[in-house]
Amino acid sequence: MKQIILLGDSIRMQYQPVVGEKLADIAEVSGPEENGRWSGYTLNSLRFWLPTLPSPDLVQWNCGLWDMGDDYQEGRHFYPPDLYEETCHRICRILRKVTGKPDLPLVIATTTPTLHGDHEDIRQYNDILRKVAAEENAVVNDLYSVVSPANAEMICEDHIHLTPAGIEAVAEQTARILRGLLKGTA
C-alpha cells in the first residue's frame, strides 16, 4: 500500500480524513495531528513530524493563511512574501532530504479563499506557491479555484474554514490529483 502524507494548516486537517477515505483502495493517508500553522512552523516541525509518520511515496503540503496574516496589526504580513518564498523552497528541499528521497513527488496546495477582503494577498501568495512548485518540480493542487466560485456555500460562518460541501469539494480534487500521481497519470 502506498503512503501519502498531508501537511498543512487547519484546512488540511478538515479534508484529510475524507481524502483518506477516497484513496483507501490504493494508499494510506496520514499527517501530523497538529496544525502546521505558517510556513516557518511547518519547516521547523518537519524534523519532529516525519520520524513519526510512515515513509512517504508522495507528500502534499500547504501553508499560507497564517503567513499572510497581520495578527499584531503591524501593517505587514506575518511572513512577508520574500521570506514566504524562501521558506516554501526550503520545505520542498527538506522534505526530500529528510525522507532520503531526492525525487519524492511533492504536491503544493494553494491557499483557499476566505470571506474577508478582496483576496489580493491570497492570490499573491498563491502565485508564490506556483513559482516555487515550478522551480522545485512539484505539482500544484489549486484549492483556491475549487472553493472560490462558491465561497458562500463552501466557507463557514468563521469566514475561513470549510463547510461540509467545501470539505467534500477540496477532498475530491485532492484525491483525484494524488491518485493520478500514484498511478502515473497526473
Give the label of every model feature segment:
Residues 1-17, 68:
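Catalytic nucleophile-elbow at a beta strand-turn-alpha helix junction centered on a G-D-S/GDSL motif
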Residues 9, 34, 160:
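Conserved donor-binding loops in enzymes that form glycosidic bonds
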Residues 22-28, 43-186:
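Alpha-helical cap/lid subdomain in secreted, periplasmic
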Residues 13-14, 37, 124:
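Short alpha-helical
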Residues 31-38:
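Short beta->alpha junction loops
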Residues 6-8, 31, 110:
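Active-site neighborhood of phospho(di)ester-bond hydrolases with catalytic His/Asp-centered motifs
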Residues 6, 34, 62:
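Short glycine/serine/threonine-biased micro-segments
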